[in-house]
Amino acid sequence: MSRAQLTLSSKNYSSWSLRGWLLCRLAGREVDEQMVAMNDPGNRAELLLLSPSVLVPRLTHEGASVWDTLAIAEYLNELYPDKGMYPPDRIARAHCRSISGEIHSGFSNLRSALPMNLKMRHETFPVFSGAKPDIERIETIWQECIERYGGPFLFGTQPTVADAMFAPVTRRFITYNVTLSPVATAYCETISAWPLMQEWITAAAAEPEEMEELEVEF
């Protein structure tokens, strides 16, 4: 079986890179990682030839080039339907797709207010009022899923696409010490203990201490 290539940016800062990588690993795919600095004009020009969006992640596999995290999720699910990327139940599967789409396309105030930085810890950090409805909505999503499907992941005992999509949010909450409900706090702890997340955090810690801020949507 040919290996896939996944184009990524900083593991410390890029939430979209994290999502794409988690999705590949959920599907059981080992990938060759192509790391690019998005603020390097040469890298941007090269990536433009490969991915019209000039964004990461981008998955290259057996002649297919797939960008956008949800497109990557659907592509991998087609290839590996037995890997449990989505819940087996039709209604739960629809729910999983819906909340994955919601985090993919929404919550812009949260993204701006709490950019991902895995190495940083703030004991006190002012969260501007525009981000608070986003935080409340995310807590509601998690609470409903865990109460309905039993946890500790959003759709039961095994992680799904939805957990990959929300994983960077848990790290934002931890970095900025956001006050959360007990259920949301427990979910953040579940994602932190997930072996795949631990692997990513370890790799992020090994990146250079100082990096120019990347020109991607975090």
Which residue ranges define each predicted feature?
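Residue-level detector of family-conserved "landmark" positions at structurally sensitive sites
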Residues: 34, 69, 183, 201-202
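Tryptophan-centric aromatic hotspots in well-structured domains and transmembrane helices
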Residues: 15-16, 21, 67, 86, ...
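Short Asp/Glu-rich motifs
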Residues: 43-44, 192, 210-211
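Short, contiguous strand/loop micro-motifs
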Residues: 6-8, 34, 157, 174-175, ...
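Acidic/histidine-enriched, glycine/proline-rich intrinsically disordered or flexible terminal extensions
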Residues: 204-218
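GST-like fold's C-terminal all-alpha helical module
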Residues: 103, 107-196
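GST-like domain detector, emphasizing the conserved glutathione-binding G-site
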Residues: 1-128
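Conserved beta-strand edge residues that scaffold enzyme active sites
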Residues: 37-40, 187, 205
